[in-house]
Each structure stands twice: as structure tokens, then as C-alpha cells.
Design a protein with these regions (language model features):
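Nucleotide-sugar donor-binding/catalytic module of glycosyltransferases
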Residues: 1-246, 403
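C-terminal subregions of glycosyltransferases and related glycan-biosynthesis enzymes
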Residues: 123-124, 226-437
Length: 437
């Protein structure tokens, strides 16, 4: 890696009709204390105030710039267009409701210079606006973790085992939770059809898998630099929600991605939002790139069908969405001579009752849930500061530091109660009795 003390960073923000949330995203970008930084907002034909929001932010901070592919090209092509505008250095991609934590870019630059690697990941916290996933807003923080070097071969083998790219905290996808050098991005482009980087229907998880295969190892930082945001306009929520407006948004999205079928081993089916299926599509697509050096074990299609069905049974999908995914899985099963087995799986599997996400304050083995509405965290900018401060507190508040704080407090209290010397006697300060007229 170039040892320049301030390597160039570009944050691309492909977006469409998210002006209400984008303004808070850009506030988190503008607060960065790093000069060699460019924020590129690529607008895919928004009909709201997106351009005005970006240009107003750009007048205040020249690091922020508005670009557009010139029409409604769809998410995938908008990402590719934005990536085309990036100058040599490092790149991070975000959505129009994601953000950067305070001092995020400068801290990330220090980490990359320390490791000397061109690919890195971190545990990004997650913020949900009120009314997005639930009535109240929510901030989710990961428990403190240690930084480490990850072997790419181990990471890729784990993707085959779990078939759940999005749950892998070490995934180096440069969408919100990772960063990549433009040299690695260009390396993938040279292997890809038509010189594109984004060759799968959706752009996020593929980047982590294909880039991991380009290097022997990459860095994982226990410190977060960015934050995921979820708003009512988020694409993933559009498919899980069952109201008519959400269905319309997801139908519009499918129209754009239908031109890019999944891998031939997935029967060339249209895009599926099932994480299991997407993980397999990313793996197979990367594997087939000419000269791609990544390696992973053979994928069991029977296991993929089983895990996909379990995901579909989780109670988050509405009835018509379930039917669509079952049809896709049935075609994939038929491609591999597993249709009878798959239909037996369907007959023997029971769906969970419809459920809502966890709401309120809570804690699990690896995450902390904070009710943002209760604590006055209203938007992504607020959440970014809260995540940064709470993350620092969690990292530094070790059992040892807590014990030292308690011991110091006790020692101070004991010193304050200790009896000292008595006051000097009257002879040393009295001027004698004075008469009163």
C-alpha cells in the first residue's frame, strides 16, 4: 500500500429519492476531519429534492459532489457509474441513509497504514429510523472485538459453510462495512465481462467475496468507522414489508434487476432476496472470473435449498412473496435433479408465525439494542455520534478499568474523611475581645 500519510478516500453514495435521509448522511460526511476525501452522490433520476440537498451540502463543503448517470438506470448501473468516477486510492460505498462515524476516515487511514493491507472490514453499528422497521428508532451496537488479520481462504470456506454473507462480521464488502483499494477493484474489472465490477444483480455482498479472493489476507478492525442506516425507503425493507407502497417499490426494483439473471447453476433465475441464494450466486460468479485466485470447497445445492427454505419459513415474508421464492427454488432444484427432494422439504417444513423485529432496549450475546426514541436519538447524525461515544466507552470500560475507577473513588472518599490537624488556637489569630458601643 502507498505509505502516503493521507491516502485518498472516495465515498460513493448511489441513491434515488432519499433526500429526507440523505441530508443526515451528508452531515456525517461533512464532519470528517480528513482533507484528502471526496463524497460522490450519484443520483439515479430522483424526483424529490436530492439534487438540491447535495448541492447545498457541496456549497458548504467542497468535498461533496453531485453526479448522475443521466436517468433511471437502476441500482446496479448507478453503482457502476459512481465507481467509474473514483480516482486512485481507497473506496467505500454507502446508501443514501447510511453514514460515517465521527473521525471515521482519519481513524480508518491510520488503521490501513498500520496494517499495510488494501482490504479491510469492521463491525458497523446499525441505526433504524422510527417507522422503518418498528414504531421507535433503534441503534444496534456490536460487542467490542479485537482487530486481526483474516486469511481469505478461511473466510471463503466459511461462506460455503454458512451461506450467509450478510451475517459474517468479517466480510470485507466495501458497502458500508469495508474499504478496498481502487487497485483491487480494477483487478476485478479486468477479469469481468465488459470490464464491469458489479456483475451480479445486487452490488453489496459480491464485493466482499470477489475481493477476498484477490488477496491472501485482509484486515479486520475491532473499531467501527461507518454506520448502517435503515429508513422506510430502504430496498430490503421494501421486499419484507407487505403494504402496497412497499410492494410497488420492490416491483420497480425487480424490473431493473430482471435483466441480470443469477448464475447458470442457479438455473438462470431472476434475482432472489434470500440471503442463502445471493451468497451462492456471489460465490459462483466470482469463481468463474478468468484467473480469479480465490478458492473454496464445493457448494452443496441440497444444503442451499434446505437453508433457503428455513430462511423463507422465518415469518418475515408475506404470502405472495413466499410463492415467488418457492417458484425460484423449485427451478433451481430441477436444474440439479433435486426437485422431488425439494418438494419433500417443502411439505415437511412449517413456517413460523409472522413476527416483528425486537423493539426497545435489550442485549444479546454479541449485540446491544438501544431504543433511540427513548434517548432522543432522532436521525443518523445523532446515531453516529452516539455509536462513536458508546463504542469508545465499551472498548475502554474493561473489567480492569472499572475496578481501577472503583478503587480510585473509594480511595478519594477515604482521604476526604481523614482527620487532619486541628485549627490553630485563639492566641494565634484572636485580637482580643472588642467592646460594643
Amino acid at each position: 500500500m502507498n505509505k502516503d500519510r493521507q491516502p485518498r478516500f472516495t465515498v460513493i453514495i448511489p441513491t434515488k429519492d432519499r433526500a429526507e435521509y440523505l441530508k443526515h448522511t451528508l452531515r456525517t460526511c461533512a464532519l470528517q476531519d480528513y482533507d484528502n476525501l471526496e463524497i460522490l452522490v450519484s443520483d439515479d433520476g430522483s424526483t424529490d429534492q436530492t439534487r438540491e440537498v447535495v448541492e447545498e451540502a457541496g456549497r458548504k463543503d467542497p468535498r461533496i459532489r453531485y453526479v448522475t448517470p443521466g436517468g433511471c438506470v437502476g441500482m446496479r448501473d448507478n453503482f457502476e457509474f459512481a465507481l467509474d468516477q473514483v480516482k486512485p486510492g481507497f473506496v467505500i460505498a454507502m446508501g443514501g441513509d447510511d453514514g460515517i462515524l465521527p473521525y471515521g476516515v482519519s481513524r480508518l487511514a491510520d488503521f490501513l497504514l498500520e496494517t499495510g493491507l488494501e482490504l479491510a472490514a469492521w463491525p458497523a453499528p446499525m441505526f433504524s429510523y422510527a417507522k422503518a422497521r418498528m414504531e421507535t428508532g433503534q441503534l444496534v451496537l456490536h460487542r467490542p472485538r479485537k482487530s486481526r488479520i483474516v486469511e481469505s481462504s478461511i473466510f471463503l470456506a466459511r461462506q460455503v459453510e454458512t451461506l450467509n454473507y450478510i451475517a459474517d462480521i468479517e466480510s470485507p464488502m466495501f458497502y458500508v462495512k469495508g474499504v478496498a483499494s481502487t487497485r483491487l477493484v480494477d483487478q476485478v474489472r479486468r477479469r469481468s465481462p465488459e470490464g464491469r465490477f458489479y456483475v451480479c444483480p445486487t452490488p453489496d455482498g459480491y464485493s466482499g467475496i470477489v475481493l477476498a479472493g484477490e488477496v491472501e489476507r485482509f484486515a479486520f478492525s475491532g473499531e467501527a468507522y461507518t454506520i448502517y442506516g435503515t429508513s422506510p425507503t430502504s430496498q430490503g425493507l421494501g421486499y419484507l414489508a407487505n403494504d402496497q407502497e412497499a410492494k410497488k417499490r420492490s416491483d420497480d426494483f425487480f424490473k431493473h434487476v430482471s435483466a441480470v439473471p443469477m448464475h447458470p447453476e442457479l438455473a438462470g433465475q431472476p434475482y432472489s432476496p434470500l440471503i442463502t441464494v445471493m451468497t451462492v450466486d456471489y460465490l459462483l460468479t466470482a469463481r468463474d472470473l478468468p484467473g480469479w485466485p480465490g478458492r473454496f470447497p464445493e457448494i452443496s445445492m441440497s444444503r442451499m435449498l434446505e437453508k433457503s427454505l428455513a430462511e423463507l419459513a422465518h415469518g418475515l415474508y408475506g404470502g405472495d412473496r413466499v410463492l415467488r421464492e418457492l417458484r425460484i427454488l423449485d427451478q433451481i432444484a430441477g436444474k440439479h435433479g433435486l426437485r422431488d427432494e425439494f418438494r419433500r422439504m417443502v411439505q415437511s417444513t412449517r413456517r413460523f408465525a409472522a413476527k416483528s423485529p425486537f423493539e426497545g432496549d435489550g442485549i444479546s450475546s454479541d449485540r446491544v439494542f438501544i431504543d433511540c426514541t427513548r434517548y432522543g436519538i432522532h436521525d443518523l447524525f445523532d446515531a453516529a455520534y452516539a455509536a462513536y461515544c458508546l463504542g469508545n466507552l465499551a472498548e475502554k470500560a474493561t473489567p480492569g478499568s472499572i475496578a481501577r475507577a472503583f478503587a480510585g473513588s473509594v480511595a478519594y472518599r477515604l482521604r476526604s474523611l481523614r482527620k487532619g490537624e486541628p485549627f490553630p488556637g485563639p492566641a494565634s489569630w484572636s485580637e482580643g475581645e472588642q467592646g460594643v458601643d
